[in-house]
Every structure is written in structure tokens, then in C-alpha cells.
A protein has these predicted regions:
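Flavin-dependent oxidoreductase catalytic cores
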Residues: 1-204
């Protein structure tokens, strides 16, 4: 394994198996641990299930117990959409850490919020303004890397996530899914009653 020739940590992420009838997570995790993996992340759904079923956190608890004696940390993943979800996963599974996936789309603040909840028992949710501003930062950086047209196409779905929970967001998201230029995104916020935010001296 890479650990034999590199000082960099190597982590492995697995699902519970290909189908419910053929779970393979125990064998996969054991092989990873024996090969020198520094940590194993488990998403307790089968490949065939996709996101159709709820994540089986019981598998996370089982894997954590199995690898505890081997000194290999276990990261849990699946159905973690809020700081409260993350805390509950840690408490109920004994996992060493939580890996966010879809829960972080449109809400990069979830990492800070979760840390605050775990450290203090409370957290300050990010405002709608902060989330939209973060969305524009991501859009602009993506445009710098991939070009404006490609970035705007890619950000349509992401921006819908950023605007989730915003008053009037349903109508706003219709405008966002048709955006082809950064100016279209700004115009969507100008034309929608959902938000009136200032970004870089301009009104969205």
C-alpha cells in the first residue's frame, strides 16, 4: 500500500456492499486495516440502493467496534445534514469522526456549526446572507478555474442548495436554474423578492 512508500496518510472510503444480499464492508474494512490504512470511512448504504434507503448507522457502530482494537479510526458518513445529526451519529455509533457529503452542499458553514455544537452545546446558524455570499464566492472562483459558462452551468444546482430556506426561494430557484452568466445569477436576486443582499458593492 501507499503507506509503505509515503509518509502521507492513506484513508479508505467504502460502502456497505454492492447489494443488500452481498454485504462486503467487513471484508473491505479488514483488508484496508491490514494493508495499513490510517482510517476507514463507511457510508452504510449499498451501491444498488443509492440514496433510496436510509443510511444504516448500525453498521458504523459495528465497524467502529471491529476496528477499535486495531487502532484504525472510523469515520461515519450518510444522512448527516445538520450539526445535530453529526452529534447524534458520534453519540450513537462511537465513530471517531463524521464525514459530511450532501449535507455540506450549499452550507459550508456546517463544519463550523458542528464544531461549536460539540464544544459548547450550541451554535449560531449562518444567515441566509452569509450563505448566498458564500455561493457567489464559489461561483467566481469556479469561473476563474473553468470559465464563466461552465461554472454557471455547474453552479445551478449548487446555488439552489445555497438558497434553501430563503424566503421566496422556490421562485428564486426557478431563475437560478436558467442562469448562464454570473450577471444572470445577480439579476435573479435582484428580480426575486426572496433576497436583497449586497455583494461587492452590488445588489444581487
Amino acid at each position: 500500500m501507499v503507506t509503505a512508500v509515503s509518509p502521507l496518510p492513506v484513508t479508505v472510503k467504502i460502502r456497505s456492499g454492492w447489494t443488500a444480499e452481498s454485504p462486503s464492508w467487513k471484508e473491505a474494512a479488514r483488508a484496508a486495516a491490514e494493508a495499513g490504512a490510517n482510517a476507514v470511512t463507511i457510508h452504510p448504504r449499498t451501491r444498488a440502493a443509492g440514496y433510496g434507503d436510509s443510511a444504516d448507522w448500525g453498521i458504523i457502530a459495528e465497524l467502529t467496534a471491529c476496528l477499535k482494537g486495531k487502532g484504525v479510526p472510523v469515520f461515519g458518513s450518510g444522512d448527516v445534514f445538520s450539526p445535530e445529526d453529526a452529534r447524534r451519529m458520534l453519540e450513537t455509533t462511537g465513530a471517531d469522526a463524521v464525514m459530511f457529503a450532501r449535507g455540506a452542499l450549499g452550507n459550508p458553514f456546517i463544519f463550523r456549526e458542528t464544531r461549536e455544537l460539540l464544544e459548547t452545546g450550541a451554535y449560531a446558524p449562518a444567515s441566509s446572507e452569509a450563505r448566498i455570499e458564500a455561493g457567489f464566492r464559489e461561483l467566481e472562483r469556479l469561473a476563474a478555474d473553468e470559465g464563466e459558462e461552465a461554472a454557471c452551468r455547474k453552479m445551478r444546482k449548487r446555488f439552489c442548495a445555497y438558497s434553501k430556506g430563503v424566503a421566496g426561494g422556490a421562485e428564486l430557484r426557478k431563475l437560478l436554474t436558467a442562469a448562464e452568466r454570473i450577471a444572470d445569477y445577480r439579476r435573479a436576486f435582484q428580480d426575486s423578492a426572496a433576497a436583497c443582499l449586497t455583494h461587492g458593492g452590488h445588489i444581487f
